[in-house]
UniProtKB/Swiss-Prot annotation:
Taxonomic lineage from the root: Eukaryota, Metazoa, Chordata, Craniata, Vertebrata
Originating gene: ATP13A3
Keyword GTP-binding: no
Organism: Macaca fascicularis
Any GO CC annotation of this UniProt entry: recycling endosome membrane
Known catalytic reactions: putrescine(out) + ATP + H2O = putrescine(in) + ADP + phosphate + H(+)
Localization, UniProt: Recycling endosome membrane; Early endosome membrane; Late endosome membrane
Binding site for Mg(2+): D498, T500, D883
Protein name from the UniProt record: Polyamine-transporting ATPase 13A3
Residues binding ATP: D498, K499, T500, F628, R684, D750, D883, G884, A885, N886, D887
Membrane topology: Multi-pass membrane protein
Cytoplasmic-facing ranges: 1-28, 50-205, 254-409, 470-940, 984-999, 1095-1105, 1165-1226
Broad class of where this protein is predominantly found: membrane
Length: 1226
């Protein structure tokens, strides 16, 4: 096998990686060991930081199949390296490892073949992960996932559970009987312990890991260097600061580990009952569960310790831990195609597709429904970190790096500082050699330049603004689990919103119903709760077709179901465990009308009277429920009226879907027109259908019948019209975002015309804007995929800006040409099906549609995630605001995902708002902008601080002098740290503005700002340094120098002079040092004021009272000790006395410096706002962002947007680069 081979694991997935094989080389290891000794351990540190260097330095390439070590590199933009050691799992060591047991193979690496002759589904057994001769399996662990060697694909692959490649039929036929004890033990050997092990590292381990951070190693190097130069006080101060920083970091990291550990520990070890092949029930610990175990769900509920598919019974589950949605969800058993001859056929089981039948790890089972003697059973499909909760925990434990231009530019800037330090390093060596300085002193002073140029406090200073922003967000009810994303939120220029519960109220009000009789719509009716309708099929559907349940006596479930059930005023009763036990079958949920609604006599003949009627009692039992599926956009139930021989099937859902499943002759001919009339007004419309089932369908047959056998050939019954009002604050928030030039997009699962109406009503689409509906059709019957373009236009303005009023907002299709379209704004609207077709067959059109796509309706959860990715691909910074239930993927994928949830923190989203209002979005963007500008300010200040101090030291090195220990201490602690941590306290500006903050440090205006301030500070510092030498009283300073007495200004205490003789050898005390110290101290404060930006992104600096007080105090203190020297202060700071006239001269230099610095910085700001856009427009510079470049192209494209009533077809196969030929048919 080729030793230079490279393979890909997790291909096509988010964690796709390249893999290389290596074997340990003894001679390389010996050379590295020698290098470690020669470098005093530094080489070992370097190899610790760089895993790829470590592997390449100690190993040689080898075939992946036979290697001892694997080197992994992610294929994303970060190209991160990891290494892992190959381990061997010996199956022969297990007591059950007999030839017979070894022949029982795992289907697709996971499923046990319980038959003697494995089918095609079972062709991949355990042997594909092992070598047949020794029965040993080679594997490695990366990010808590085990990857086993697969002989079939000649690559490493992670061991899958029953969640992939297993059909629904196979679930029942091959796995529902349970495992033998031997096979259970065998699988446990492979899958390991079922736990999401979040081990809280020991303090010592965390300490070592933290201390070995390059930043602290550099600080350790600095402290050792300063100590050798007898800068003990400054070195001690840095040590104290580092200890405080390390302790604080350790506390924070350990606290996060403990919180995460406690979150997963709730279900880590519980006792569960499992069914074995011989039908015995065995009680085991949840940690011993393996895929294939049949778990018995207890009657009183439990916290799920794994992912399991329900095969018997019904469960009410709270999934708030995963989704943030507190509404209980009903889970039913997985459909069994093998027992239903009318089913459409078998399908592969998938936890996401079949999530209504899957119990997810960490969720709470509240109640169960069961048959006596037939317990509620679920088959374990995934364990440990493979579960849905395990994957979430992994995303927290091993987050992807934050790809943000600011951080990339910061590293480049640090490299620039290192280069500057290198110049100073060389200059110091040359200057010292020319002055015949001792070798030891040369080495110390040269290295000292490096420690000055790269400021040790930079990382802490950069995070200060984020920490303060996080605290401010917490005060307004926004919680964050990813603080680094706060800065990124400052760059958001597009926000996607879910509709229901986000833009609109959670609750829907029943506006009315419109029933159908004889395939014709009756007049709309407002009141459903009346005697005339109580026994109609329409009301029976409302009473039964829902997923409501009683929890602790309170009716709970989906808000939409609750509103419908409350509207009819019926009563729901559920059987108790005792009542169920008295029967040989599960007791159904029963609904019945209150007595006052039941008519005393037979209703009029024109009412629907298909239901069997009892004179005394009328109630309906819900026999079987097919829960709502967002993919299918419908739900259905099978019910029976008490005393009736036949059962009834009821269905409700999206009108278009329901109509397609009904007999065509029962659907009114004007169905589409009536539906559009309601949806264009912003109403949410739900259709109902019904049919009588055959009498041969018994109770038990219904429990095993497929969904498709029920949901067809229905009778269309009519429409329910729900009014979904906008939240009061929605229009104002969207208006604020529009004023700030932040695009808004609606992503909803609702009807498209309803979504367009709501978008107009809330101001997302202005009345004068055009709406283009893209209807994409997939290839069919040899015809290529195509897109039909329809134009919609609003004739009247919205009736009320804050609610979807009952007055009509009619929408008409525009068929005439729109010559003025280029002069108006336009928006694209499409549904989820069209979006998927366009992604697959019209990839060239996707960027164009993303530029103006505003309404995306009927979107499934995975389509929402794809939309976020498509928007990011054209360089938008995308925010997403949703309820956390169906938006988990999109919330995590967006640059800034914010979930509206009552929970303080949700793993579903980086940000969580306790206030269920989109007002959190502008608040988050404002704080993000403030934090971003703070980071820029702090970085610029720290860069200037290092350059100013670097130049001060370089100047003094030229006369073989330096800053004193306490001078360093005063500058770094009293000035720099105080200024950095107070200048970061500026709150966010009170409103969003159209201007956007810069995204990186490498920009013309920002670089000019920094370079101009560097030149100014160097210039004035040089002026003071060389001018002091020209003074008539100047002389080379020595302990007996007395320039002050020469001018009669001040008499120094002679004892003070005598005490300074011990410092002569360092030449700290001299006139140049004193001059440079005073001027540079003022310069730090000057650039702090110049760089402390206020509006439009932060409050003015004069409102930052801590900063103002700190700067004034420092100014007054430095000015006082400069103009009126205090002997004790001068002695500590090693300042010499200079004539009063020179002190005044230094003050003038400082004042002029301040004037020039602040004036130049203000000019740079004005130049950026006024001249830069003009310069860019004159130069016709190509925008960096793809969407801006695309917008320029489309302005001159005569074929875009598509003309009314045209069709775009995809011609030929999609090419490798994703392009396709487009033809437009008028």
């Amino acid at each position: 096998m080729d030793k230079e081979e490279r393979k890909i694991i997790n291909q096509g997935q988010e964690d796709e990686m390249e893999i290389y094989g290596y074997n340990l080389s003894r001679w390389k290891l010996a050379i590295v060991s020698l290098g470690v000794i020669c470098t005093g351990g530094f080489l070992l540190l370097l190899l610790y930081w760089m895993p790829e260097w470590r592997v390449k330095a100690t190993c040689v390439r080898a075939a992946i199949k036979d290697c001892d070590v694997v080197l992994l590199r992610t294929t994303d933009e970060f190209k991160m390296w990891f290494c892992a050691k190959i381990r061997v799992l010996s199956l022969e060591t297990h007591p059950i490892s007999s030839p017979k047991s070894m022949s029982n193979k795992l289907s697709n690496g996971h499923a046990v073949c319980l038959t003697e002759n494995p089918t095609g589904e079972n062709r991949h057994g355990i042997s594909k992960y092992s070598q047949a001769e020794s029965q040993q399996i080679r594997y490695f662990t990366h990010h808590s996932v085990k990857y086993f060697w697969n002989d079939t694909i000649h690559n490493f692959d992670f061991l899958k559970g029953l969640d992939e490649g297993v059909s629904c039929t196979s679930i029942y036929e091959k796995h529902s009987a349970g495992l033998t004890k031997g096979m259970h033990a065998y699988r446990k050997l492979l899958y390991g312990v079922n736990e999401i092990a979040v081990k809280v590292p020991s303090v010592f381990k965390l300490l070592i890991k933290e201390v070995l951070n390059p930043f602290y190693i550099f600080q350790l190097f600095s402290v050792i260097l300063w100590s050798t130069d007898e800068y003990y006080y400054y070195a001690l101060a840095i040590v104290v600061m580092s200890i405080v920083s390390i302790v604080s970091s350790l506390y924070s990291i350990r606290k996060q580990y403990v919180m995460l550990h406690d979150m997963v520990a709730t279900h880590s070890t519980v006792r569960v009952s499992v069914c074995r092949v011989n039908e015995e029930i065995e009680e085991i610990f949840s940690t011993d569960l393996v895929p294939g175990d049949v778990m018995v769900i207890p009657l009183n509920g439990t916290i799920m310790p794994c992912d399991a598919v329900l095969i018997n019974g019904t469960c009410i589950v709270n999934e708030s831990m995963l989704t943030g949605e507190s509404v209980p969800v009903t889970k039913t058993n997985l459909p069994n195609p093998s027992v239903d001859v009318k089913g459409i056929g078998d399908e592969l089981y998938n936890p996401e597709t079949h999530k209504r039948h899957t119990l997810f790890c960490g969720t709470t089972v509240i109640q169960t429904r069961f048959y006596t003697g037939e317990l509620v059973k679920a088959i374990v499909v995934r364990t440990g970190f493979s579960t849905s909760k395990g994957q979430l925990v992994r995303s927290i434990l091993y987050p992807k790096p934050t790809d943000f231009k600011l951080y990339r530019d910061a590293y480049l800037f640090l490299l620039c500082l290192v280069a500057v330090a290198g110049i100073g390093f060389i200059y110091t060596i040359i200057n010292s050699i020319l002055n015949e300085v001792q070798v030891g002193v040369i080495i110390i002073e040269s290295l000292d330049i490096i420690t000055i140029t790269v400021p040790p406090a930079l990382p802490a200073a950069m995070t200060a603004g984020i920490v303060y922003a996080q605290r401010r967000l917490k005060k307004i009810g926004i919680f964050c689990i990813s603080p680094q994303r706060i800065n990124i939120c400052g760059q958001l220029n597009l926000v996607c919103f879910d509709k229901t519960g986000t833009l609109t109220e959670d609750g829907l009000d029943l506006w009315g119903i419109q029933r159908v009789e004889n395939a014709r719509f009756l007049s709309p009716e407002e009141n459903v709760c009346n005697e005339m309708l109580v026994k109609s099929q329409f009301v029976a559907c409302l009473a039964t077709c829902h997923s409501l349940t009683k929890i602790e006596g309170v009716l709970s479930g989906d808000p939409l179901d609750l509103k419908m059930f409350e509207a009819i005023g019926w009563i729901l009763e559920e059987a108790t465990e005792e009542e169920t036990a008295l029967h040989n079958r599960i007791m159904p949920t029963v609904v019945r009308p209150p007595k006052q609604l039941l008519p005393e006599s037979t209703p009029a003949g024109n009412q629907e009277m298909e239901l069997f009627e009892l004179p005394a009692i009328y109630e309906i039992g819900i026999v079987r429920q097919f829960p709502f599926s967002s993919a299918l956009q419908r739900m259905s139930v099978v019910a029976r009226v008490l005393g009736d021989k036949k059962m009834d099937a009821y269905m409700k859902g999206a009108p278009e879907v329901i109509a397609s499943l009904c007999k065509p002759e029962t659907v009114p001919v004007d169905f589409q027109n009536v539906l559009e009339d309601f949806t264009k007004q912003g109403f949410r419309v739900i259709a109902l259908a019904h049919r009588k089932l055959e009498s041969k369908l018994t109770w038990h047959k219904v429990q095993n019948i497929s969904r498709d056998a029920i949901e067809n050939n229905m009778d269309f019954m009519g429409l329910i019209i729900m009014q979904n009002k906008l939240k009061q604050e929605t229009p104002a928030v969207l208006e604020d975002l529009h004023k700030a030039n932040i695009r808004t997009v609606m992503v909803t699962g609702d009807n498209m015309l309803t979504a367009v109406s709501v978008a107009r009503d809330c101001g997302m689409i202005l009345p004068q804007d055009k709406v283009i509906i893209a209807e994409a059709l997939p290839p069919k019957d040899g015809k290529v995929a195509k897109i039909n373009w329809h134009y919609a236009d609003s004739l009247t303005q919205c009736s009320h800006p804050s609610a979807i009023a009952s007055e009509a907002t009619p929408v008409k299709l525009v068929h005439d040409s729109l010559e003025d379209l280029q002069m108006t704004r336009y928006h694209f609207a499409m549904n989820g099906k069209s979006f998927s077709v366009i992604l697959e067959h019209f990839q060239d059109l996707v960027p164009k549609l993303m530029l103006h796509g505003t309404v995306f309706a009927r979107m499934a959860p995975d389509q929402k995630t794809q939309l976020i990715e498509a928007l990011q691909n054209v360089d938008y910074f995308v925010g997403m605001c949703g309820d956390g239930a169906n938006d988990c993927g999109a919330l995590k994928r967006a640059h800034g995902g914010i979930s509206l949830s009552e929970l303080e923190a949700s793993v579903a989203s980086p940000f969580t708002s306790k206030t269920p209002s989109i007002s959190c979005v502008p608040n988050l963007i404002r704080e993000g902008r403030a934090a971003l500008i703070t980071s820029f300010c702090v970085f610029k200040f720290m860069a200037l601080y290092s350059i100013i101090q670097y130049f001060s030291v370089t100047l003094l090195y030229s006369i073989l002098s330096n800053l004193g220990d306490f001078q360093f201490l005063f500058i770094d602690l009293a000035i720099i740290l105080v200024v950095v941590f107070t200048m970061s306290l500026n709150p966010a500006w009170k409103e969003l503005v159209a201007q956007r903050p810069p995204s990186g440090l490498i920009s013309g205006a920002l670089l000019f700002s920094v370079l101009s301030q560097i030149i100014i500070c160097i210039g004035f510092q040089s002026l003071g340094f060389f001018w002091v030498k020209q003074q008539p009283w100047y002389e080379v300073w020595h302990p007996k120098s007395d320039a002050c007495n020469a001018t009669g200004s001040l008499l120094w205490n002679s004892s003070h002079l005598d005490n300074e003789t011990e410092l002569d050898e360092h030449n700290i005390q001299n006139y140049e040092n004193t001059t440079v110290f005073f001027i540079s101290s003022f310069q730090y404060l000057i650039v702090a004021i110049a760089f402390s930006k206020g509006k439009p992104f932060r409050q003015p600096c004069y409102k930052n009272y801590f900063f103002v007080f700190s700067v004034i105090f420092l100014y007054v203190f430095i000015l006082f000790i400069m103009l009126y020297p205090v002997a004790s202060v001068d002695q500590v700071l090693q300042i010499v006395c200079v004539p009063y006239q020179w002190r005044v001269t230094m003050l003038i230099i400082v004042l002029v410096n301040a004037f020039v610095s602040i004036t130049v910085e203000e000019s740079v700001d004005r130049w950026r706002k006024c001249c830069l856009p003009w310069a860019l427009s004159c130069g016709k510079k190509i925008p960096k962002a793809k969407y801006m470049y695309l917008a320029q192209e489309l302005l001159v494209d005569p074929e875009w947007p598509p003309k009314p009533q045209t069709t775009t077809e995809a011609k030929g196969l999609v090419k490798e680069n994703g392009s396709c030929q487009i033809i437009t048919i008028t």
